[in-house]
Amino acid sequence: MNSKSQQQEQQPIVFVTGTDTDVGKTFVSTLLVHKWKAAYWKPVQTGIESDQGDSETLKNFKIAASTWQPPIFTPTYALQKPLSPLQAMEYEPNVDIRLLDFVVPEEWSAENPLVVEGAGGVCVPITRKLEITTDLIKHLIETSGHPVYVVVVARSGLGTLNHTLLTWNHLCDNGLRSHLFGVILNGEPNEGNVQALKKFGVNIMAQVAQCTTAHDQDMELHELPSVESLMTQQDVE
């Protein structure tokens, strides 16, 4: 059996990044975790001096249509200031983040997918060597032994064309096109932006809106594709 066939039989790691901060990565990660019955890991958490952190947010977010209780793994690094990891380290000089420190949690049974939520966007600096989120994604591809894919979360409204295309093209230029599941647009549905992005070759996985009722949650979960269908699509492409 070749390595590609072996990877296809393994549960994937899906890295969720965004076009900006506060675009809804944690909300979308929550939906994906419940849709796919996945585990969750936030490798680097910042801003814990004033916020409970995304792991707690995801844990406390109740999905009425789901009985799944996701395994949630502790961040490798948790920094106090609500800044990029590089900037947050300036306030904690004893912390020195290195890519080699990021190892897939041993507690992950690999019986289900693992959703990994990044900090900010693809160019956010993570280490003192100025390694960025994209470098972390590559590191996981090289070291995890599992197929690794990327989901980009973007706003649905005005300005998303520029931000989404910059992010998409950056990932493609860094050799990650074959790892891209696609983009999830978060916010009020905007079919014009969907069609415009498709013209540039961007795969739109779904549009999701903020859920205010259990019915809304059920509808959003139903609209999201299965991880198996996405992996099959990547194999065909």
From Swiss-Prot:
Q: What is its EC number?
A: 6.3.3.3
GO BP terms: namely:
biotin biosynthetic process
Enzyme active site: K42
Sites binding Mg(2+) sit at T26, E117
Q: Which domain of life is it from?
A: Eukaryota
Cystine pairings recorded for this chain? none
| HAMAP family given in the database record | BioD
Give the protein name, as stated in the record. Answer: Dethiobiotin synthetase
Gene encoding the protein: BIO4
